[in-house]
Amino acid sequence: KENLLYHTGINTEKLFEVLVKQISAGLLFQKNTDHTDSDLKRLQESAEQKAIDFITFLPEMRRILSTDVTAMYNGDPAAQNKAEVILCYPAIRAICNYRIAHKLLELDVPLIPRIITEMAHSETGIDIHPGAVIGEYFAIDHGTGVVIGATSVIGNRVKLYQGVTLGARSFPLDENNNPIKGIARHPIIEDDVIIYSNATILGRITIGKGAVIGGNIWVTENVAPGERLVQA
């Protein structure tokens, strides 16, 4: 037990050092101007506090990720055990990267969250924006081609299959014909929803609790709780 606590402490210190370095780099990139010594000191202090807040959240993140593993295992009869899910399933890699990135984004860390999710995107073919809000017991089966947009909101016990897109419709433009940033433009997926392969759900619509969306469907309007939307 003492050895475990010792090694945990050592690794936590190493993690803190890495986090501070990376968060500082992100903050410097965001400012993109010359810095005085006092600016750099404040930036360093900010990076250290964000690193502390992130590390403090790790036990809760581990708990949430364990629910995702459980959902993947329970939903896939081919899974022999949870260790197989953790080590072999690309969706777990993508979800893990997302949950790390999302917390960093909540802490106002620039750039780094997007890098983390794009690493998983390039490795798994699963594109989850760090700005999305995703509940517990989240499962993605197979996963290749899944896209989850920045303002998507996903409840608990939701399952997606490969090729699902939670995207936006046409963007409203400002007076200079540039897309207006920061508006909610992606779907809300309530608890216990299943969305089958290659379904495309666009715009700020709501897919109600317990609904089932069949494969290869294009959805741009609200779906009532418990509704089954399938091709004829």
Where are these regions (language model features)?
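Terminal amphipathic alpha-helical/low-complexity segments used for targeting or macromolecular assembly
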Residues: K1-I115
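Structural signal for interior beta-strand "rungs" in well-ordered beta-sheet cores
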Residues: A120-Q231
